[in-house]
Amino acid sequence: GLRLSEEKTVITHINDGFDFLGWNLRKFKGKLIIKPSHKSMKKITRKISEIIKENQTATQEILIKKINEVTVGWANYHHSSCAKKCFHTLDHRIWEMLWRWSKRRHPNKNKHWIVNKYWKEHKGRKWTFMSDKNILFLMMDMPIVRKGQISLNKNPFLDREYFECRAKRHRLNRKRAMNSNRAAQMGYYAL
């Protein structure tokens, strides 16, 4: 039969919450709230920090490409949860790391020179870390997608059209997510 691991199994109240697969699940004011766990946020922050440290002498183009590979995938994984505040927090942490990276590269230049070299105005945002070809993906631009509930009065055997339509929508959303992830891995994030 099924055996539960003693060290991995935790019994907790839903109001206290628990972490599972990078998410924190908790009931708050009668509603189930699912958001990225603190452990998951620390892990991606550490990973991006390592990328920046490993690429201290790399061009801005290469750095943007490597960071986008990680952030687009992470944002796609968490975009169906309550992640907007987490996305904003991580974008701010990445901005701070990139500011330190740019100051280390040019210790004798003033901040205005550094800003003009690495940050440009793009779509109304003055502080966009971008090169001539690439732009840093901001997780807060990722739309939060709420999953629709299945209608309880539908029968999968009788209402085939309803379930086929749901499946088609699901396939299209997965394809869109895969394409945006693939583009980021290739270093293309549209300007």
Task: Locate predicted features.
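Non-catalytic terminal/accessory segments
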Residues: 1-191
